[in-house]
């Protein structure tokens, strides 16, 4: 990972335009990881936007930064221009460009820096920088690890911690799946120390008026 971190540091140091995108029908891990990265980059004074292929579930509207998400299917021209004009595109919680729907038509791996951050198996080789680890519990956990490796852990505040916790919780069945280990709980300890409200996050997801079902271990 050290070589990938060095390459990523080089890209971020140039302060270029950045777009972050997710798979279609973004879930808790996709929204949590993309907004955690978005809020982190904003604290670094980077020019960054989050664009999702389509609308996320209403019960995720409370997530910090959610009001700044640009939904591609609602404004294809505007969102497409942002993606076309971005120097670097982060693709979160998926590992094949087909999974981001029509957004992929605006992405050019030959002229743009593509950065994959994902924890699913069998990634396709489309990104210049690939943070891909199926042994990690969630993409949110991987975002935390990358932030730590970049020396940005000190920038993680309550809002960013909330986003990270959201994805870790939803993609692990509230920390019941086999991907959860000691390292996962060390990260949870850090997030709790940032003041996140575990019960509030849980209630917003599982006790909302809209039923949310955590992905199975195979579909995380």
Where are these regions (language model features)?
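Single conserved hydrophobic/aromatic residue that forms the stacking wall/gate
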Residues: 212-220
């Amino acid at each position: 990972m050290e070589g990938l971190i060095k390459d990523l540091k080089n890209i971020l140091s140039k302060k270029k335009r950045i777009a972050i995108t997710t798979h279609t029908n973004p879930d808790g891990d996709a929204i949590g990881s993309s907004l955690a990265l978005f809020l982190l980059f904003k604290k670094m004074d980077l020019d960054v936007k989050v664009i999702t292929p389509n609308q996320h579930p209403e019960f995720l509207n409370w997530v910090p930064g959610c009001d700044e998400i640009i939904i591609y299917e609602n404004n294809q021209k505007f969102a497409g221009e942002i993606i076309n004009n971005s120097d670097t595109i982060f693709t979160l919680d998926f590992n094949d460009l087909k999974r981001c729907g029509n957004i992929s038509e605006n992405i050019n791996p030959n002229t743009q820096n593509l950065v994959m951050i994902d924890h699913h198996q069998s990634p396709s080789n489309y990104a210049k920088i690939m943070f891909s680890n199926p042994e990690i519990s969630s993409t949110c956990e991987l975002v935390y690890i990358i932030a730590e490796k970049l020396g940005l852990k000190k920038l993680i505040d309550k809002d960013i911690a909330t986003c990270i916790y959201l994805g870790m919780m939803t993609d692990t069945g509230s920390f019941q799946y086999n991907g959860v280990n000691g390292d996962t709980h060390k990260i949870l300890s850090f997030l709790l120390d940032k003041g996140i409200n575990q019960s509030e996050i849980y209630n917003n997801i599982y006790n909302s008026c809209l039923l949310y079902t955590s992905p199975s271990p195979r579909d995380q």
